[in-house]
Amino acid sequence: MQTVEETYPIRKSPRIPQYDYSTVNSYFVTICTHERRCVFYTKGRLNPLGLVAQNCLLEIPKRYVGYRIDKFVVMPNHVHAIITIDAAVGKNLSYVIGQYKSVVSKVGHQLYPGLEVWQRSFHDHVIRNQRRYDLIWNYIENNPLQWKEDCFYLHDT
């Protein structure tokens, strides 16, 4: 009989080893859709699932004390956000993003049965100073204008 390790590939975590992701800090988060499919936009506008992704992101500070969404954008096939943890809280960033993805997926399955919304995990960057924060804030602000040059761009929506 095969072990779990022999059956499934061992994936390297994209998180910084031994870093506490519940630490007071700002984080640049990118969450991509499954196979980078453009599921959040129809004809260049947020569709019902895109609105769910947006509204659920805005709910994070209401559900998790100490969390703040400083800047975000829902793009056709990914979400960018600056998430700040203001106070030491029990829930780390991975838990909160996991819950966000779960809620959006659940509604996505109701709207579009059989749709796999998200790719596994998410990308994060610990923002270590104001200069990086400002650069990332501007990147998110300008992301919709630069969609065709974006590394996540596959085709027009």
What does each of the following model-derived ranges do?
Residues 1-157:
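Short catalytic/metal-binding and nucleic-acid-binding patches
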